[in-house]
Amino acid sequence: MAEGHGDAKGATAHTAADGGHKAPFPPFQKETFASQLVSLTIAFVALYLIVSKIILPRVGGVIEERQKTIEGDLAAAQKLKGESDDALKAYEAELAQARSRAQAIGAETREKLNAAAEAERKTLEQRLAAKIADAEKTISATRTAAMGNVRGIASEAAAAIVQQLAGIQPDSKALDSAVNASIKG
């Protein structure tokens, strides 16, 4: 075996030489209690003074500064919210005005277009009425001319038929009155 390891004889001898007892842990020694309490009191007083005079004011200042910053930010946010609400109201009012103007412009344009369309329709109707009247005059003149030609042709045809069938020359007045009676109806 290795030296120092597992040597039970050496361990027993060492314990037996000390008598089996060692000195107590220093904080538990009765002789040093008073000096330890004084040292502990001085340390806690020093720690209290450092914390209360240096650290707490700094931390308090930081907390106070942070609180002021938060309050300032909240006030600025409230102000900006009010401004944005006002801007939104102004935008909505402008939008409503724009809508009403657009509707008015649309109505005005619609009225103008309707009036223009009505005027154009009336002009077109007048032109068509004039064209129809001209066409009726032309038709009437053409009919009169055609009827005049038909009378002449009918009179000649009737005279030719009578001469062919009867072998006589018919009277022109009698022939014209018979053709006129036949044409009238």
Swiss-Prot record:
It is found in: Cell inner membrane. The keyword Cytoplasm does not apply. Residues 9-18 have a biased composition (Low complexity). Keywords: ATP synthesis, Cell inner membrane, Cell membrane, CF(0), Hydrogen ion transport, Ion transport, Membrane, Transmembrane, Transmembrane helix, Transport. The keyword Glycoprotein does not apply. GO terms for molecular function: proton-transporting ATP synthase activity, rotational mechanism; proton-transporting ATPase activity, rotational mechanism. It is a single-pass membrane protein. The chain crosses the membrane at residues 37-57. PANTHER family: ATP SYNTHASE SUBUNIT B, ATP SYNTHASE SUBUNIT B', CHLOROPLASTIC. F-type ATPases have 2 components, F(1) - the catalytic core - and F(0) - the membrane proton channel. F(1) has five subunits: alpha(3), beta(3), gamma(1), delta(1), epsilon(1). F(0) has three main subunits: a(1), b(2) and c(10-14). The alpha and beta chains form an alternating ring which encloses part of the gamma chain. F(1) is attached to F(0) by a central stalk formed by the gamma and epsilon chains, while a peripheral stalk is formed by the delta and b chains. This is ATP synthase subunit b 2. It comes from Rhodopseudomonas palustris (strain BisB5). The lineage of its organism: Bacteria, Pseudomonadati, Pseudomonadota, Alphaproteobacteria, Hyphomicrobiales.
